[in-house]
Swiss-Prot record:
Keywords tagged on the record: Nucleotide-binding
Protein name, as recorded: Nucleotide-binding protein BcerKBAB4_1061
Similarity section: Belongs to the YajQ family.
Any GO MF annotation of the entry: nucleotide binding
InterPro entries: DUF520, UPF0234-like_C, UPF0234_N, YajQ-like_sf
Transmembrane portions of the chain: none
GO cellular component, one term: cytosol
Role according to the record: Nucleotide-binding protein.
Amino acid sequence: MAKESSFDIVSKVELPEVTNAINIALKEIQNRYDFKGSKSDIKLEKEVLVLTSDDAFKLDQVKDVLISKLVKRNVPIKNLDYGKVETASGNTVRQRATLQQGIDKDNAKKINNIIKEMKLKVKTQVQDDQVRVTAKSRDDLQAVIAAVRSVDLPIDVQFINYR
């Protein structure tokens, strides 16, 4: 009997990379001329980014700097869920961005439906915040990976534990 192969579909954000990107972005903000004397800041509180600045325009600039640094460090920006801009103390504005870790039930169902529509001999299991795909043929697994990558999901997915 042939051994089954499998892999896991996950959605993870590496927090050390996020911290590094924040530090680089803060360094750039401190050195930029248009931010001289401004109260712009980026903080990471557990899995929530807090962006603070003087006004909405500068907040957008801070967000642009942060996104560029996150992209350079290969952090998926699809997994950032921005809240609304709110006023903070001292005539500043603040925006929270939640880092989405793991695949929620709705996205797991979407991935499951994508795989089932292919009509290959593969089995899928939703395990907490990941989806495991098993099959006897590694070619089928490769086809599943290609299909899931080709679909535009609201979160960024990675494929791990390919055995």
